[in-house]
Amino acid sequence: MMLITTSHRPTRRTRSFGHDLERVFPNSLYMTRGKKTIQELLMEAYDRGYERLLIINVWKGNPLKMTFIKVHPDDWGYLGYLYLHGVKLQREMGFRGLNPIREDMPLVVTTAKRVGLDHLAFAQVFSELTTGKFVPRGDKSLLSIADKYNTDVLAVIERHPRGIVVNFYRLDVTKERAVGPLINVKIWIMEDGRRWDYKEAFGIKVKPRRKEGEAEEGARKDSH
């Protein structure tokens, strides 16, 4: 499925997030970045038979951005980006030491039962980014969807006051609740031009940034 790594000099929390993703993306691997360049990571992913390279970027100690790159020797390219409000790790949801899934099974991407068009659109985008299988939820239970597609792992797109969240289920671990990680997405951008921003979607006004000259003038006035 994918090779998962981080930007250079990741924090412990970011490494933990990478390991958590390894446990919910079937047949995937988390690898310490070290000094590897993007090209070296792409070759590593290609040699291992992966279709995607995922790089987790850090800001102030926390995962900030997930960059998805298509793996192909002649046609590699950036696919899209998720900008995050934050994440909740598996250990913070009560699950420690889960084993990665080392067998072929699809990652099924679906939604909670009552969501809006934004959630449906993002579910399709997330399946494209991860090579997962998008399945419209309707009135079906997660168990029935998993049985139909012969999988133990589902990514469920859910509502959140500050954006959209992705929550992961491992039915081989528990059928009662999500195991995580929980990913809170505030912005997603695809290279083909599709995008979504929670502030725009929720009608939140963003204060315009002052131009450099205006900022300097304001600073001079404040100093008097």
Swiss-Prot record:
SUPFAM superfamilies according to UniProt: Class II aaRS ABD-related
> What this chain does, per the record?
Probably involved in the biogenesis of the ribosome.
Q: Which GO terms describe its biological process?
A: rRNA processing
Stated name of the protein: Probable Brix domain-containing ribosomal biogenesis protein
Q: InterPro entries, from UniProt?
A: Brix, Brix_dom_Rbsml_bgen_prot, IMP4/RPF1
Keywords annotated in UniProt: Ribosome biogenesis
Single GO MF descriptor: rRNA primary transcript binding
Q: Which residues form the Brix domain?
A: 1-196
Q: Give start-end ranges for the coiled-coil region(s).
A: none
What domain of life does the UniProt record list for this protein's source? Archaea
